[in-house]
Design a protein with these regions (language model features):
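Scaffold signal of the M16-like zinc-metallopeptidase fold and its non-catalytic homologs
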Residues: 1, 144-194, 214-216
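Short beta-strand/turn micro-motifs at beta-sheet edges
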Residues: 29-33, 87-91, 185-188, 242-246
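M16 family metallopeptidases and their MPP-like homologs
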Residues: 30-32, 37-64, 74-121, 150-174, ...
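Structured segments of extracytoplasmic/periplasmic soluble domains
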Residues: 64-69, 81, 85, 119-123, ...
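Acidic/histidine-enriched alpha-helical segments
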Residues: 80, 123-142, 226-235
Length: 269
């Protein structure tokens, strides 16, 4: 029988405090220097997520298409340049934010950050790539609808947020197919503006890396005040209950539980 580890109180937890820096244009940047290996992660975070588009698929599709081409590089050139320099780029959309995460070797940092800046500031929204992404998203949705965990998550969101919130509306193949390049461009212009941006640099941070970030992102003109993502307040009144979704022939069951707590607009958030 496997010997279980001893239960004891946690001790010696070290929480690293980030250093704050302001880029030349006023963008806030946090840096956390930890680790011994010469690698780093650069996160570019924007206000605006699934709550803020016509439907929650808009922000997800925008995050996906950013890597598919800029006004100076196509998708293949972006992929080859990052791969050649040992870098990897992840793009993600959450309820209230979109995040681009660049993982890089420090020795190639100054070569790949300009590519990230080009992706952030100059996306081209190529029609063919958008069509491919929509097909992939629709196919992924069909597969997910066969999974009990996805159905539980979807039903919970509908019950908790209601149809008056983007987070409570189900994603459909029709809502995916209706997204256009012009809609993504408009969302990008509204939310992916410098005033809505924050930067986090972590890893074995070196002084010259801060200068590279400032050179690539600190020159972008900032106009207007930062925008606040839409509220995630449920559109229906909370009432404890149990919802059962029957899926014939399912080999597993999934349970999802939740309740309202503080919102982003609450003073205690």
């Amino acid at each position: 029988m496997m010997q279980r580890p001893e239960i004891k109180e946690l001790s010696n937890i070290q929480i690293f405090k980030p250093q704050s820096t302001t880029l030349d244009n006023g963008i806030d940047m946090k840096s956390i220097s930890i680790g011994d290996q010469p690698v780093s992660r650069l996160d570019i975070i924007f206000e605006g997520g699934r709550c803020d588009g016509r439907n929650q698929t808009v922000s997800e599709m925008l995050s996906a298409i950013l890597r598919e081409g800029t006004t100076s590089l196509n998708a293949q050139e972006i992929a080859e340049a990052l791969d050649y320099h040992g870098a990897w780029l992840g793009c993600d959309a959450s309820s209230h934010n979109a995040t681009l995460s660049l993982y890089s070797l420090n020795r190639n940092f100054e070569k790949v950050v300009p590519i990230l800046a080009d992706i952030v500031m100059n996306p081209s929204f190529p029609e063919q790539e958008l069509s491919n992404l929509k097909s992939l998203a629709a196919n992924r949705l069909r597969i997910n609808r066969q999974k009990v965990a996805f159905l539980a998550m979807e039903t919970f969101a509908q019950r908790h947020f209601g149809n008056g919130s983007n987070l409570g509306k189900s994603v459909t193949e029709e809502s995916i197919d209706s997204i256009t390049a012009s809609e993504l461009s408009k969302f990008h212009k509204q939310w992916f503006a410098p005033q809505n941006m924050s930067v986090i640099l972590s890893g074995k941070v070196e002084r010259q890396m801060l200068d590279v970030v400032n050179e690539c992102f600190g020159k972008a003109p900032v106009s207007g005040l930062p925008q606040q993502s839409a509220t995630d307040s449920p559109s229906i009144k909370f009432k404890p209950d149990t919802v059962v979704v029957d899926k014939p022939d399912a080999l597993q069951s999934a349970v999802r539980m939740g309740m309202p707590t503080v919102l982003r607009t609450d003073a205690d958030y």
